[in-house]
From Swiss-Prot:
The gene is murC. ATP binds at residues 129-135. Pfam families: Mur_ligase, Mur_ligase_C, Mur_ligase_M. This is UDP-N-acetylmuramate--L-alanine ligase. Pathway: Cell wall biogenesis; peptidoglycan biosynthesis. GO terms for biological process: cell division; cell wall organization; peptidoglycan biosynthetic process; regulation of cell shape. It catalyses: UDP-N-acetyl-alpha-D-muramate + L-alanine + ATP = UDP-N-acetyl-alpha-D-muramoyl-L-alanine + ADP + phosphate + H(+). GO terms for molecular function: ATP binding; UDP-N-acetylmuramate-L-alanine ligase activity. Belongs to the MurCDEF family. It comes from Prochlorococcus marinus (strain MIT 9303). Its EC number is 6.3.2.8. The lineage of its organism: Bacteria, Bacillati, Cyanobacteriota, Cyanophyceae, Synechococcales. Gene3D superfamilies: Mur ligase, C-terminal domain, Mur-like, catalytic domain, NAD(P)-binding Rossmann-like Domain. It is an enzyme of class 6 (ligase).
């Protein structure tokens, strides 16, 4: 059943210095961590000072605190080989460091080209999809690690098992998260490709769903074999996968996880392969979407030749990546959870999991919450504009909603794509649902203070800086004025 055949090779000399412009980004830092641990001289620049940058420095990466031409001069001195410069889509052509690298005639690679080289250099599994790819690749990495495979991992989130988003393993396998946001995943030629699901997103890059489908098809064709989600209508209609998985049926699929029990602290399911029951698993995570992510990870491991019995033993160690229903702490009787959900489908799935925790009375939180206060930060004007009414429908699953200003992610404003417009859409669709809009982040913390109740689950969602809400709550100043309470 094993797929793997290509020998482990290296496309880069270990003497090759590598410099990352924007090294603190989640995708860039993962590559930097792997390469520095493989013996390369690695440097980078990033104006942000955060735990990622601290981790890079601790591993031996030289990180400049600005992005200037002087950095290029510094890394080019006293080296036998000129540095290779790596950039991401987020780095504009006007970046002074990038301009200096071009003037110095340094070789410049997009991060996707570097990742593509790593993927092709050893047996690899690349995980793509609109939703769940970070969780799936994290669960896959963890299962491989707990079965003594020690994979190399390039993930778009922190893998709890390694407490890192990048790991230079000594095993034969590489796991990579394949981001579709800029279309660069078509460069990846993995031994096994995995597609978790597909629906329209990243409308700043894709004109329509057909363009996204065609891009993902190119990714699938570039992989030696393809594992896909049978429960996704778009994948089922448009893709010819080598193997399929489902959490709804065991008929006509290669792998299935059929739930027996779904509650707020775990999921129990029967596992099937080719229609044959293999055994039962207990997943220490709630939510049908997490069961699907776990089934994808298990299926990928089985295709890589691992035994089901070994995988069963590793399931107890599974944890989602950082910022996926991430319990941050308790504040004045409220439990604060942070989640990366920033698409209507993700918001809906996250709120469904929160509701399951409330209704079942079972949870891995310190105590079962009684009510859900959704604190949502829309991410990108283009996404807010495209999915305004879908976001309004999804947020209706909460008991009350607070909205932060749109996190631009570098985009220019679009008329009507505002948090106030979203609030109005919520009021139309859910007239009895309390909703309020914050003018800024400081007011948002005051709104949480005013509108939440003891026993609430304060669920912060978004891909911007909403993860700082917990820190802000612990530093609340006494406010003289605040809008009327939603909690009444």
């Amino acid at each position: 059943m094993s797929l793997w055949f290509c020998p482990l090779t290296s496309t880069l000399s270990r003497q090759q210095p590598i410099h990352f412009i924007g090294v603190g980004g989640i995708g860039m830092s993962a590559l930097a961590l792997i390469l520095v641990n493989r013996g390369h001289i690695v440097s980078g620049s990033d104006p942000r000072e955060n735990t990622t940058v601290e981790r890079l420095r601790a591993q031996g990466v030289r990180v400049f605190r600005d992005q200037s031409a002087a950095n290029i001069n510094a890394i080019c001195s006293n080296v036998d080989l000129l540095p290779l410069v790596v950039i991401s889509t987020a780095i504009p052509k006007s970046n002074p460091e990038l301009k200096a690298a071009k003037l110095s005639q340094l070789k410049i690679l997009h991060r996707s080209d570097l990742l593509a080289a790593l993927i092709q250099a050893q047996p690899s599994i690349a995980v793509a999809g609109s939703h769940g790819k970070t969780t799936t690749s994290t669960l896959l990495t963890t299962l491989l690690a707990t079965t003594d495979q020690d994979p190399t991992a390039v993930i778009g989130g922190v893998v709890p098992y390694y407490d890192s988003n990048g790991h230079a393993g000594k095993g034969r396998l590489l796991v990579a998260e394949a981001d579709e946001s800029d279309g660069s995943l078509v460069k990846f030629q993995a031994t096994l490709g995995v597609i978790t699901n597909l629906e329209l997103d990243h409308t700043d890059h894709y004109a329509d769903l057909d363009e996204l489908i065609n891009t993902m098809k190119r990714f699938g064709r570039g992989c030696r074999r393809l594992l896909a989600n049978f429960d996704c209508p778009i994948l089922k209609e448009h893709f010819d996968a080598t193997a399929w998985w489902s959490v709804k049926t065991s008929a006509g699929v290669d792998f299935a996880a059929l739930p027996i029990c779904l509650n707020g602290d775990q999921t129990i399911a029967d596992i099937y392969e080719q229609g044959k029951r293999m055994g039962q698993i207990t997943l220490p995570m709630p939510g049908l979407h997490n069961l699907s992510n776990a089934m994808a990870a298990i299926a990928a491991c089985r295709l890589a030749g691992l035994s089901f019995e070994d995988l069963q033993q590793g399931l107890a160690d599974l944890q989602p990546p950082g910022r996926r229903f991430d319990f941050r702490g308790t504040w004045e009787g409220r439990q604060i959870v942070d989640d990366y959900a920033h698409h209507p489908s993700e918001v809906s799935a996250t709120l469904a999991m929160a509701r399951l925790i409330v209704t079942s009375g079972r949870s891995q939180l310190p105590s079962p919450p009684k009510r859900i206060l959704a604190v949502f930060q829309p991410h990108r004007y283009s996404r807010t504009n495209e999915f305004l009414y879908e976001f309004a429908r999804a947020l209706g699953e909460a008991d009350a909603v607070l909205l932060a200003p749109v996190y631009s992610a570098g985009e220019n404003p679009i008329q009507g794509a505002t948090s106030e417009s979203l609030a109005n859409a919520i009021r139309i669709q859910h007239p009895n649902l309390p909703v309020a809009v914050a003018e800024n982040f400081n007011q948002l913390t005051l709104l949480v203070q005013k509108h939440s109740l003891k026993g609430d689950l304060v669920l912060a969602m978004g891909a911007g800086n909403i993860n700082n809400l917990w820190r802000q709550l612990t530093r609340l100043d006494n406010a003289k004025t605040c809008p009327p309470s939603l909690a009444a």
